[in-house]
């Protein structure tokens, strides 16, 4: 009997133990990352040929204590390597682990290599050569604290390399893990199996090989025992012949079918090639189509299983597409696959929540460094009066109602950008804005008292419903989480895409950026104020302070202003403002752009203007500004400075976003100014629910 070890992915140990016992292994003991077991030479070959779950089959050679590099050298040399190596066999050493003595794995591997080579030269035997790429023998050494474990890797390359996959194409899951996913899916061989996101076909190929009794090692061309002195070629050929016979019989007798699809034609062609190399190509139908085109290939039965490893993302901007994908899959399963089973393997349990399905079973496993979960679902059978599956129905209905009303209004007004939904329903606390054929969902970060998992799932539902109601592709939906912050956080960069979208607002054309910043470059609630400025600007010198991207300057210029002066502290936004002006044919000396601290510039300027627009921050304490600013505290002082620049008969339009702002009318009167509130006149139908989004005033000399 040989003492052996089979390694596997974390989470698959018990499944591997069961498999090895079925092959005839005895004394199986599960440990983290694998199974210790015992077996004769035939079982070694059987486990190499037939294990669908083992990553490697290891034959332990010995252990030694390592307190110095000499201890490692002598411990390795104590093994009788001349009884392990065939004459002329090449080898490679894989060394892992460090301690106070062996601080570099390459150094450890070198000491092991020297010990093995010297074991031959001391007996006046030809020294074996090292071949790091394709050795006849692989020696593994693991150093854990002071103990080194030395073993022979009988697999050679990892057992997940079955020999059928095109190794130029990366696979998101190894074949051994794919086999485990199939085994845990609840699928019964002999029933249909479908993968709607099959990629290179690994799940379907592993399932077909299992169902047709085709050994996973049958197509491998190289093994780790080819240079092993104790290798028994006769027994190996018997094991191999048996596997070939069973494969032919299994394929001839199998009657069910497999279905795979993917949106990438190149990947599908690779899947077909892989299936042909695996010997089961005739059993699998591969098609180029995406999940939106998914339909039941057997609507009249029999029932089968849908299995997949759907994509997931780690970046926020990838979530809308992934949420839409999962939501669509869930609805399609409920509407077309009643009576079927569904099994999905994912690194994102949150995304699986978008299916709107309740799992019957779930399993955990590692996919490389990723913690993953596999969830199995049974899809209830549909009846003639079953309603199509929906998601976030209350929200979807409100969005649909708003769209019907506001879309017509926006078209009549000649605007492409408007707020479609503004936390109309408390449980769906988001804002949804339209920018042409794009949509932006802004979610305020929920308070800590709200369960984060529930809040995230609610957001996923909102995204799925928004895509459905608006009928836009996922790549035209942008998701943002907006903290309730002060100062100039809206100027902080979120991304580096640099993608700009041209939109129309009345007679103006403007650039917006939906992804790179918290705000898009266009404050939608100030739309009417900008139009009013355009109507007031003819023949006037216009000043735009805290100008942001200069959209008010564009409207003033198009309204016939004699000149526009646009002032902002940000070089980025001034360059953006210049692009906006040029887009509308406004350039030259009549349209100045000034980068400056607006408050400092205001105190030093000695020019005169007929119309001034100022939309300062509620509060600012920027390092680049010379002082802090509070709009409630400082607005009278601000008006004092503005009055100095205002020509006789001129007008200041003053707006801010401070809730509960109180205009100091007495303070203005002392300056000889009067204020007329025009807030209600500047609120458009899309902001009718949020009357406090800004306040706006016209200020003139008394």
From Swiss-Prot:
It catalyses: guanosine(2445) in 23S rRNA + S-adenosyl-L-methionine = N(2)-methylguanosine(2445) in 23S rRNA + S-adenosyl-L-homocysteine + H(+); guanosine(2069) in 23S rRNA + S-adenosyl-L-methionine = N(2)-methylguanosine(2069) in 23S rRNA + S-adenosyl-L-homocysteine + H(+). Keywords: Cytoplasm, Methyltransferase, RNA-binding, rRNA processing, S-adenosyl-L-methionine, Transferase. Its main location: cytoplasm. GO terms for molecular function: 23S rRNA (guanine(2445)-N(2))-methyltransferase activity; RNA binding; rRNA (guanine-N2-)-methyltransferase activity; rRNA (guanine-N7-)-methyltransferase activity. It comes from the Bacteria. SUPFAM superfamilies: S-adenosyl-L-methionine-dependent methyltransferases. Specifically methylates the guanine in position 2445 (m2G2445) and the guanine in position 2069 (m7G2069) of 23S rRNA. InterPro entries: 23SrRNA_methyltr_KL, DNA_methylase_N6_adenine_CS, RlmKL-like_Mtase, RlmKL-like_Mtase_CS, RlmL_1st, SAM-dep_methyl-trfase, SAM-dependent_MTases_sf, THUMP_dom. Residues 43-154 form the THUMP domain. This is Ribosomal RNA large subunit methyltransferase K/L. Its EC number is 2.1.1.173, 2.1.1.264. The gene is rlmL. It comes from Salmonella typhimurium (strain LT2 / SGSC1412 / ATCC 700720). Belongs to the methyltransferase superfamily. RlmKL family. NCBIfam families: PRK11783.1 (NF008748). It is found in: Cytoplasm. GO terms for cellular component: cytoplasm. It is an enzyme of class 2 (transferase).
């Amino acid at each position: 009997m040989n003492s052996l070890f089979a390694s596997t992915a974390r989470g698959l140990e018990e499944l591997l133990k069961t498999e090895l016992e079925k092959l005839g292994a005895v004394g199986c003991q599960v440990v983290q990352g694998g199974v210790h077991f015992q077996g004769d030479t035939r079982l070694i070959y059987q486990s190499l040929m037939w294990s669908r779950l083992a990553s490697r089959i290891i034959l332990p050679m010995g252990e030694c204590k390592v307190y110095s590099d000499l201890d490692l050298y002598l411990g390795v040399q104590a093994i009788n390597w001349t009884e392990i190596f065939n004459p002329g066999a090449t080898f490679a050493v894989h060394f892992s682990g460090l301690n106070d003595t062996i601080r570099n794995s390459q150094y450890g591997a070198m000491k092991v290599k020297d010990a093995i080579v010297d074991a031959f030269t001391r007996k006046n035997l030809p020294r074996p050569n090292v071949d790091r790429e394709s050795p006849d023998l692989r020696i593994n050494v693991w150093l854990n604290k002071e103990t080194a474990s030395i073993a022979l890797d009988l697999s050679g390359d990892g057992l997940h390399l079955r020999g059928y996959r095109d190794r130029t194409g990366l696979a998101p899951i190894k074949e051994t893990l794919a086999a485990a996913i199939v085994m845990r899916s609840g699928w019964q061989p002999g029933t249909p199996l479908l993968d709607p996101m099959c990629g290179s076909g690994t799940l379907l190929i592993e399932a077909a090989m299992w169902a047709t009794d085709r050994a996973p090692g049958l197509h491998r061309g190289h093994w780790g025992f080819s240079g092993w002195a104790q290798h028994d070629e006769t027994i190996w050929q018997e094991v191999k012949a048996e596997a070939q016979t069973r494969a032919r019989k299994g394929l001839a007798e199998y009657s069910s079918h497999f279905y795979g699809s993917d949106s990438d034609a190149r990947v599908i062609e690779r899947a077909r090639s892989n299936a042909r190399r695996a010997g089961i190509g005739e059993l699998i139908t591969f098609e180029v189509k995406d999940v939106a085109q998914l339909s039941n290939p057997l609507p009249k039965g029999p029932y089968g299983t849908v299995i997949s490893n759907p994509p997931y993302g780690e970046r926020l901007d990838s979530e809308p597409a992934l949420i839409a994908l999962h939501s669509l899959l869930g609805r399609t399963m409920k509407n077309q696959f009643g009576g079927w089973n569904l099994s999905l393997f994912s690194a994102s349990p949150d995304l699986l929540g978008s299916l709107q399905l309740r799992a019957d079973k779930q399993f955990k496993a590692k996919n490389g460094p990723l913690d993953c979960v596999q969830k199995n679902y049974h899809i209830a059978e549909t009846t003639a009066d079953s309603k199509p599956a929906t998601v976030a129905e209350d929200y979807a209905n409100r969005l649909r109602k708003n769209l019907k009303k506001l879309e017509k209004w926006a078209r009549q007004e000649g605007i492409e950008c408007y707020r479609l939904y503004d936390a109309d329903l408390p449980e769906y606390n988001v804002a949804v804005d339209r920018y042409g054929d794009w949509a932006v969902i802004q979610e305020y970060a929920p308070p800590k008292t709200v369960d984060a998992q529930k809040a995230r799932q609610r957001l996923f539902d909102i995204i799925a419903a928004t895509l459905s109601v608006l009928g836009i592709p996922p790549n035209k939906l942008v998701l943002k989480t907006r903290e309730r912050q002060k100062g100039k956080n809206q100027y902080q960069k979120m991304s580096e895409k640099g993608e700009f979208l041209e939109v129309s607002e009345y007679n103006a054309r403007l650039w917006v950026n939906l992804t790179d910043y918290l705000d898009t470059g266009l404050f939608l609630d100030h739309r009417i104020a900008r139009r009013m400025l355009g109507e007031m600007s003819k023949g006037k010198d216009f000043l735009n302070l805290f100008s942001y991207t200069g959209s008010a300057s564009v409207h003033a210029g198009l309204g016939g202003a004699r000149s526009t002066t646009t002032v902002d502290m940000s070089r980025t936004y001034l360059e953006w403002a210049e692009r906006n002006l040029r887009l509308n044919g406004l350039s030259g000396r009549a349209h100045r752009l000034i980068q400056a601290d607006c408050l400092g510039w205001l105190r030093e300027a000695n020019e005169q203007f007929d119309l001034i627009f100022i939309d300062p921050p509620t509060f600012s304490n920027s390092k680049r500004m010379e002082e802090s600013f509070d709009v409630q505290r400082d607005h009278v002082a601000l008006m004092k400075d503005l009055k100095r620049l205002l020509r006789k008969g001129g007008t200041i339009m003053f707006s801010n976003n401070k809730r509960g702002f109180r205009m100091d009318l007495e303070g203005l009167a002392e300056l000889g100014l009067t204020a007329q509130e025009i807030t209600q006149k500047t609120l458009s139908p899309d902001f009718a629910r949020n009357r406090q989004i800004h306040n706006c005033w016209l200020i003139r000399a008394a």
